[in-house]
Amino acid sequence: MAKTRGVLLPCWKRVIPLLAAMVLTGPACTQNPPSAAAPPPAPAPSESLATSVPLPTSPTGTATPTSGTPAAATPASDPAAVLTGIPGMDFSALSPAARRELATVMSDEFCYCGCPHTLGACLKGHTNCKHAKRMARLAARMVADGGPATEVIVTLSKYYASFREPRAQLKVDPRMCQGDPKAPVTVAEFSDFECPFCGKARPILEGFAKKNAGQVRFCYLPFPLSMHANAIPAGQAALWARDQGKFWEMHDALFEHQENLKPESLPALAKSLGLDGAKLAAVLKTDQYKQELEGFRAQGRSAAITGTPSVFFNGRFYDLGYEAEMLAHSLEDELEWRTNNNAWSAD
């Protein structure tokens, strides 16, 4: 069973504990389990993040080594043989159980660099392949958190395939973005102010964006869920404050008072920010901003999201979990992919 240390899980996974224990990562608050719809090569950040390219054959997952290629890594029944003798890599700190799972991953999964070799064979046969080392470190993090090999392999295959899939078309509001508008990577988050998982992800995502301010522009897209009674009025308050020039101040206040977002409590929040609480109270009695909120939700549905938080790197769905190390890893991958015109650099 996979542990979930440091990873935020969806509301439906909380409702179904067995599934929760078997899932490594995912969005958080959602009404229904995710469907099989695929998430939407890297566009330049702009108010419209859209692109579409042909989907080449992926070297990962079900690829089969061609004749004459090196044999796959030693069977995972002998973890010591699989994991030792890899230049520059030491997995001795992993538990015996984690080493067994990692050995299976290295024996069964193929390196994403494009070669026809398993990860283990690539690490030992192509010592200059930086991609194999990055993939191995990512897999090691996952098994260290308790991820079984079968789930790690699926997660890795989906993650690397996502770079070659068409990107989601996301329109962001610059007033609801932080960071350099010209940053090479726009990280867009669909979020619900009443979602507890969004509240937990918030400091991680914002800290990541601030740490990488020169490379990341962080944008917020409201995605109020019907399961949260106060999500719509909270969204109205945020958009109203945006029009007063204080979106992020209201954004922070809403999350800091997440346990009490009833409409009658929101005018006091506005007043604490130096805004006119009476005007907000009047807005909340109308349908003002509801159509705009529905527009954001339509964007999310078009991007095949099923819950919050849901994050995209330049329109590429991110599903490695809300940990600083995982976010940094995906940022490095996105920068390489973008720099090399939607391809991995040659080893």
Which functions belong to the PLM regions below?
Residues 16-26:
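Bacterial N-terminal signal peptides
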Residues 170-185, 210:
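A short beta-strand-turn-helix
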Residues 3-16:
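Bacterial N-terminal signal peptides that target proteins for export
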Residues 214-232, 257, 287-290:
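Thiol-based oxidoreductase modules, predominantly thioredoxin-like and allied folds used
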Residues 108-124, 193-197:
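Local cysteine-cluster metal-coordination motifs and their immediate loop/turn environment
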Residues 28-32:
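Bacterial signal peptide processing site
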Residues 96-112:
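Immediate flanking context of iron-sulfur cluster ligation sites
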